[in-house]
């Protein structure tokens, strides 16, 4: 578990990656339920990005899905959303904030639209990254939904705070 915590610190990635075999990455991924994602990255499906970026992206997804239930289970009526957000994003935000927009848009096709929106709820400072046109274009391609339907979904969920210029343009 200590190793897992270290891996989630952005400064350890280059050192850890140089000394880690693909099989070890897969073992770690199994622990966090993201084996398929790691395997896809290692097999070169995202070949235009470096191994460092692959690992960073996969760790982000692992972090997101691993910690989310923990914090949801610990919620009570006295827990404020802002307290949850600051605790929830302590480690993961630094990973997301270091991602180039292009890289996040590629990896976002692994995430469901609700996961992407959950990232917005968890850390308002990440809104600009998640709200990028490229991220939602990837979702449009993956989900294969016509633009008007995506626009209706966005309009019916104003609390999410998503503005999607391509939808506004018609």
From Swiss-Prot:
Record-annotated F-box domain positions: 93-139
Matches recorded under PROSITE patterns: FBOX
Annotated signal peptide: none
Classification via Pfam families: F-box
InterPro entries: At5g39450-like, F-box-like_dom_sf, F-box_dom
Highest taxon of source: Eukaryota
Matches recorded under PANTHER family: F-BOX PROTEIN FAMILY-LIKE, OS08G0105100 PROTEIN
The protein, known as: Putative F-box protein At5g39470
Organism phylogeny: Eukaryota, Viridiplantae, Streptophyta, Embryophyta, Tracheophyta
